[in-house]
Each structure stands twice: as C-alpha cells, then as structure tokens.
C-alpha cells in the first residue's frame, strides 16, 4: 500500500515482497559446501491401460494374450543434482559474501536436460564511525534448458502417440518397439529420412521418439541483477539514502523440426524457429527520513523521489 510505495516506489503500490540476500558475518570466515540429489519416476503417475484387447485407435479388436507395458518403458528416471558453495568473511568495517550453485537435471523423457548456474556476490561496509553504510550486491544466472517437452496439445506432445498406440501392436502391422527403433526411415523418392508411424501424417499424433529426437529445442536465459545502496546518517534524527538497481534479462530460444514432421505444424522441408529478447529495468531513488521519539510517541517522516526506466527489444524468425 502507500507505506510500501513510499519506501520502494510506485511499483510497490499494491505491496512488496522483500528478498534479503545473505551477507558476511563480523569476525568469522565460513566456507560451506552442500550437495543434494533427487530422483523422479513418472511411471507411478501414468494412466492404467487395458491389455486384453488389441485393435486400432477407434475400437477394440480381438482379444490378445497380453501386451508389453511400453508406456512405462518410454519414461526414464529423472535425476536432479544441486551443488552449492558459499564463502563469507568479515570485519567490523567490511563484510563479504560469495556463493555459487549449479543445478543439473535430466528429465523423465529422453534427451531433456536443465543446466543452471547461479553466482552471488555481496559486499557491505561501514565508514565514518558507522554513519555511512554501503551495500553492494551482484547476482548472475545462466540457465540452459534442452528439449523441454510440450506441456499439452496434440502435435508436439509425445504422450499423445504413446497413449493412443493400439495395445498389442497394430493389427497386421508392427509393434511399438519397432516404431521405437525405427522412428525414421529412408524415403527413396526424397532421398532423406522421414517420420515412421502407423497413422496418417495429419492424425493429431506423431511417433513419440520422432518428437524427442527430431524436434530439438534449446532455451537459454541470462540474467544479471545489480544493487547499490548508500545510507548516511546526518544526525540523530535525519538519514539520507540513495539506492540503485539494474535488472537485465536475455532469453534465446531455438527449435528445429526436421522434414517429416506433421505438416500441420511444419513445412514439407521442416521448420525453424528462433527468438531473442532482451529486457532491462533500471530503478533509482533518493530518500530523506526523519525519526524522533518524544516520550511515548515516535515521529516518522519521509521525503523522496524515485525514477524507473524499462526497455526491451525482441526479434524472431519462423520459417513456417
């Protein structure tokens, strides 16, 4: 509300969430390392399928003796490892804090991965008998996500073809394992490898292994946040403070769809998509505060000004 807006500018008119980063401690030097690994198994969350009747996608066919549970075989165990290192040191005058963390994970669907690096550096200092306080902080982040699966829909979702494939295999045709190892086949007419699947090219589904191998995508994000704060105590009642903040974000995305992909979402020769965006937000404020306690009353007053500038640009290309 108004108090938050007075302290943090007009952007905080509806409230503010303050995130305070760690800083060094006086008289102590600490080095900390931690490592954490988690495993994820998607097999426990997939639907239950009948394995008694074969046939095509529109109806059940003849009774069969059973079907391999290829849906569970499609998924792998996802593994995420987080390693972090921090260093803190300080004296009465200056305190230093540095940290680095790496997150690397592989998803439950093949060829998907996440690699993330976080750096943080903070320096705090006090001068002039603690009348002047300086606080500087820089955070750097780089993230690379490869082959992020489609969250829903038909054409880009490998689960569509996985779940709709006939139990026991296609009548008079091949098993699911065949389409797993032969998700692409050589087309003599075009002299190239094209998608191999039991349905027509525009049936809302594609070979799941074609989607995970022949539609690679890569999303990279770079982010830098820098903060600087200066606070000077003029006397017992007045304090003047200046703060500055810069937040830069760069996103890069690339996706390739090889020839043979469903022509509802790609051309006969494939499709190429690339996007790049850069956003910069700069904020600064200057504030004079007054505080005095008179018996059972406390008087607080603030006077200040703030400035904010947001800019961004983006460029993209889509061959389809």
Regions found by a protein language model. Give the residues of each.
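Short Gly/Pro-enriched turn/cap motifs at secondary-structure boundaries
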Residues: 74-78
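A beta-strand signature from Gram-negative outer-membrane beta-barrel systems
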Residues: 1-32, 80-82, 103-106
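Transmembrane beta-barrel architecture of outer membranes
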Residues: 82, 114-120
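Short, solvent-exposed loop/turn segments at the edges of secondary structure
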Residues: 12-14, 116, 281
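Surface-exposed loop/interface segments of Gram-negative outer-membrane beta-barrel transport/assembly proteins
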Residues: 25-68, 108-109, 118, 122-223, ...
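Structured alpha-helical segments in the cores of large, soluble enzyme domains
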Residues: 79, 83-89
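Residue-level signature of outer-membrane beta-barrel architecture
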Residues: 21-23, 89-91, 125-127, 230-232, ...
